[in-house]
Amino acid sequence: MKIVIVALPGSGKTTILNFVKQKLPDVKIVNYGDVMLEIAKKRFGIQHRDEMRKKIPVDEYRKVQEEAAEYIASLTGDVIIDTHASIKIGGGYYPGLPDRIISKLKPDVILLLEYDPKVILERRKKDPDRFRDLESEEEIEMHQQANRYYAFAAANAGESTVHVLNFRGKPESRPFEHAEVAAEYIVNLILRTRQKS
């Protein structure tokens, strides 16, 4: 099974996938941005993922995206791809999963995670290692809406199912509750598919 997990930066995808890995150690987890960074380091001398969208011309960025997709598509077994449905570039939104990419990846599921914008802002403040753009709550919500549209468009092109985990209006009763719920959802998706095989 191939699952693409998409959410805004600061949504906790890495934490979720660490929980998945604890329960299903044989699942391959690949971060699309990390694969792109390795390619961009060699070609453009980029040092940080957050520099890619600012320093690489869009036509070259597309080539890096495609090369990363080809590598990820070659992975076998259960694979979870950590990426973004849309990327903020030049004041607009660029598709993270355009047709030419999603048709190479061919995921079974695109899992979209959504949160209260305040939650995302707080998580971003706790992650000083990243060089993220500052966004207001309104901008974060607009970006989440863009993600939803892009996720469904990608699912159409990739003939994938979209699953939405919406944590808006659901405050955590304990630390990492949302991450645990999302991880359990992913684990169950994979286990159900394995049982059918």
From Swiss-Prot:
Record keywords: Ligase included?
no
**GO CC, one annotated term:** cytoplasm
Q: Does the keyword section mention Cell inner membrane?
A: no
| Localization, UniProt | Cytoplasm
The record lists ATP as bound by: A7, L8, P9, G10, S11, G12, K13, T14, T15
What reaction does this enzyme carry out catalytically? AMP + ATP = 2 ADP
Q: What superkingdom heads the lineage?
A: Archaea
| UniProt keywords, alphabetically | ATP-binding, Cytoplasm, Kinase, Nucleotide-binding, Transferase
InterPro entries xref list: Adenylate_kinase_AdkA (IPR023477), P-loop_NTPase (IPR027417)
Per UniProt, what is one GO molecular function of this protein? ATP binding
Task: Give the EC number.
Answer: 2.7.4.3
Q: Which residues fall in a coiled-coil region?
A: none
| Listed Pfam families | AAA_17
Q: Which Gene3D superfamilies match?
A: P-loop containing nucleotide triphosphate hydrolases (3.40.50.300)
EC main group: transferase
Annotated family:
Belongs to the archaeal adenylate kinase family.
Q: Which HAMAP family match?
A: Adenylate_kinase_AdkA (MF_00234)
Q: What is this protein called?
A: Adenylate kinase
What is the species of this protein? Answer: Pyrobaculum aerophilum (strain ATCC 51768 / DSM 7523 / JCM 9630 / CIP 104966 / NBRC 100827 / IM2)
Q: Which gene encodes it?
A: adkA
